[in-house]
């Protein structure tokens, strides 16, 4: 029995993609979810892309036999962020009755842009999502 058996973990930014050739392309959040799945935790995975969340759910359940709840959630939602987070909490409690750990992994950023090249708005979004979304 895994050390997280019966525990519930929320992991933000935990989607995964399957490439056209069938190869899995994970994320840091997906890697974290895999580690908790190996320890038999119930998982709540969040992200912006429903397809990536469904791919992650399917693979984690198939490989590790754990329960996975994918919840679409954009932690960069700005003023709506409280509602987004509350939806994740409510869905988790409804599905599993408890929350034992939160891994605040997701962060909005401008992909492929160096920090020096971020606009003020891009920088603010990265800071907001990284510090306040949890």
Over which residues does each language-model region extend?
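Canonical Rossmann dinucleotide-binding motif of NAD(H)/NADP(H)-dependent dehydrogenases/reductases
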Residues: 2-44
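Conserved catalytic-site loops of classical short-chain dehydrogenases/reductases
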Residues: 8, 100-101, 124
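Conserved glycine-rich Rossmann-like NAD(P)H-binding loop of the short-chain dehydrogenase/reductase
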Residues: 39-55
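Rossmann-fold cofactor-recognition segment
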Residues: 61-80
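Conserved Rossmann-fold cofactor-binding substructure of NAD(P)-dependent oxidoreductases
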Residues: 77-94
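Conserved NAD(P)H cofactor-binding loop of Rossmann-fold oxidoreductase domains
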Residues: 105-111
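Substrate-binding pocket helix/loop in short-chain dehydrogenase/reductase
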Residues: 113-115, 119-124
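Ankyrin-repeat alpha-helix packing hotspot
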Residues: 131-132
């Amino acid at each position: 029995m895994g050390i997280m058996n019966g525990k519930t973990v929320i992991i933000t930014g935990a989607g995964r993609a399957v490439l056209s050739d069938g190869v899995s392309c994970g994320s840091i959040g997906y890697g974290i979810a895999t580690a908790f799945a190996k320890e038999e935790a119930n998982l709540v995975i969040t992200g912006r892309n429903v397809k990536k969340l469904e791919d992650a759910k399917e693979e984690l359940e198939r490989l590790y036999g754990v329960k996975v709840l994918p919840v679409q959630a954009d932690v960069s939602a700005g003023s709506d962020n409280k509602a987004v987070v509350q939806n994740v909490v409510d869905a988790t409690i409804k599905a599993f009755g408890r929350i034992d750990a939160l891994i605040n992994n997701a962060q909005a950023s401008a992909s492929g842009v160096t920090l020096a090249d971020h606009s003020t708005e891009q920088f603010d979004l990265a800071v907001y999502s990284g510090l306040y979304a949890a």
